[in-house]
Structure formats: structure tokens, C-alpha cells
């Protein structure tokens, strides 16, 4: 369970590390420095953690090793972390669903992908203050297209969000404050 501490809850977002098999020491230095400075209660890796179809060629062990190294700074500090996917993650030759299962093997990972809606890693994280639900994080898959690289949030994901939001409001008698994380911004017209 994630909780406020002294009326605060710090989230550190890490995006676009875009690493391959050999993780740059500069990337790890940056992550470690940010964790030490911010002292977050949660880290959100918000897409394109890894990339490189020619680099990984679907090799699960190599992919798991790189993801483990990228999240090890959180694991070593016992800081909960979660993810959403970007447009390059699946280009490593392993589906986002398979990668999500890898993340679930790591210490300190939080999140469970919702079923029966488009995408992977659509999930909600509840943040409490004592027993009271204070805040929600909606993590939403913005998909990718292997041909052009980008896609967007699908209609049934928006409907999922609305249903979840409304069910929380009905259960708690108020709209629960929230933030969303996704890789690609929502389309607007």
C-alpha cells in the first residue's frame, strides 16, 4: 500500500532512457542522483525504457537484464516503482505483455494490468493517508505502431477510465483527485 508521509507524496518520473543491452553509466548516475535528491515515494518509468530490435532480437534474458539494471536503483532503495510503455519498448522483439510480466518479477514493482481493454499496463495505483484514499494514479497505455512508431489511447481505455473514476466517486462519495501517466499525449481536436 502506498501512503502519504507528513501530508506529502513524491513521485519521480523517469522517461525515455532508451537503453540497450549495455546500460550507460551516465543513465544510472542520473537515476541514482535523482533518487537521492528527490527521495520519492514512487517512481514512474513512463515509457521507452529500452529499445533496439537489432540489439535485443527478442532475447528475453537480455531484455530482463537491462530492465533489472534500470530499475535496480529503486529496488536497492526499496522504492516502489511502476511503468507505462512508450512507442519503442515493444521494438525489442518482446511484446509489452511479456515485458510487463518481467517487471512483475522485480522487487518493489507495483501494478497489475487491467484485462479486457486495449493495451498493456493500464492500471490504477491508490495512494492513502492512513485508511483514507487520498489520490489515484491512472497509468494508460498510449500504444505504438511498429510502422510509424506512434498510436494513441483507444476509446475503450477512455471508457475504462470513466467507469473507474465514477465507481471511485460512488464508493467514496466524492471525486478522488488524480493524475494520469502515459507516453503519448492525448489527441485533441
Roles of regions detected by a PLM:
Residues 63, 172-189:
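Active-site-proximal segments of metal-dependent phosphoesterases and phosphodiesterases across multiple
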Residues 20-22, 51-54, 83-95, 145-148, ...:
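Active-site environment of divalent metal-dependent phosphoester hydrolases
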Residues 12-15, 43-48, 81-87, 177-180:
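Active-site neighborhood of phospho(di)ester-bond hydrolases with catalytic His/Asp-centered motifs
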Residues 1-69:
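N-terminal active-site segment of His-dependent metallophosphoesterases
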Residues 3, 64-174:
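Extended active-site neighborhood of metal-dependent phosphoesterases/phosphodiesterases
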Residues 8-18, 134-144, 178-180:
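Active-site-proximal beta-strand elements of phosphoester/diester hydrolases
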Amino acid at each position: 500500500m502506498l501512503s502519504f508521509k507528513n501530508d506529502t507524496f513524491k513521485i519521480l518520473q523517469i522517461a525515455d532512457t532508451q537503453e540497450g543491452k549495455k546500460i550507460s553509466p551516465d543513465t544510472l548516475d542520473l537515476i541514482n542522483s535523482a533518487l537521492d535528491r528527490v527521495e520519492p515515494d514512487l517512481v514512474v518509468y513512463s515509457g521507452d525504457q529500452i529499445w533496439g530490435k537489432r540489439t535485443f532480437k527478442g532475447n528475453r534474458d537480455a531484455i530482463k537484464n537491462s530492465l533489472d539494471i534500470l530499475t535496480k536503483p529503486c529496488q536497492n532503495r526499496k522504492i516502489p516503482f511502476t511503468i507505462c510503455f512508450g512507442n519503442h519498448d515493444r521494438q525489442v522483439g518482446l511484446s509489452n505483455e511479456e515485458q510487463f510480466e518481467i517487471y512483475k518479477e522485480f522487487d518493489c514493482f507495483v501494478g497489475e494490468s487491467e484485462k479486457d481493454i486495449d493495451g498493456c499496463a493500464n492500471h490504477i495505483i491508490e495512494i492513502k493517508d492512513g485508511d483514507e484514499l487520498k489520490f489515484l494514479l491512472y497509468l494508460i497505455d498510449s500504444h505504438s505502431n511498429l510502422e510509424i512508431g506512434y498510436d494513441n489511447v483507444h476509446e475503450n481505455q477512455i471508457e475504462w477510465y470513466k467507469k473507474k473514476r465514477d465507481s471511485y466517486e460512488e464508493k467514496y462519495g466524492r471525486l478522488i483527485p488524480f493524475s494520469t501517466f502515459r507516453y503519448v499525449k492525448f489527441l485533441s481536436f
